[in-house]
Amino acid sequence: MTRARRQAEARGRWAEWLAMAWLVAKGYRLLDHRARTAAGEIDLVARRGEYLVFIEVKARATRAEALDSIGPRQRGRITRAASIWRAPRSSLHHLHLRYDLVLVVPGRWPQHRRAAWVPGDSARDLL
């Protein structure tokens, strides 16, 4: 692994830790972190009330860069991974699903975007 890749990995881990702390402080219960599935990895899985939330964390120099870094293909991959993760957990099947985004930018509080995308809704862009 190159030095640049190691640094990016370390920034990503730090951003995920910060996002976890932020979400727990807001009342979310963390269920999984860096959840690996056959379709790919989910940064965070949490529950709040009647919602099962799959959360992508993006750390970039600016909020615009963070928003631009998650495209339709990645949203589709996360949605597929979420279905795989949830399938064997029948105790969670009654919960509403939501796909959130946490943007981590240097010198700013994390920005939590609830319901950042809706699977299968091509008319609705990333909020």
Swiss-Prot record:
SUPFAM superfamilies for this protein: Restriction endonuclease-like
Domain of life: Bacteria
A Pfam family annotated for this UniProt entry: UPF0102
Coiled-coil blocks: none
A single MF term (Gene Ontology): nucleic acid binding
Family as reported in the entry's similarity comment: Belongs to the UPF0102 family.
PANTHER family reported in the protein's UniProt record: UPF0102 PROTEIN YRAN
HAMAP family for the chain: UPF0102
Protein known as: UPF0102 protein Mmar10_3014
Organismal lineage: Bacteria, Pseudomonadati, Pseudomonadota, Alphaproteobacteria, Maricaulales
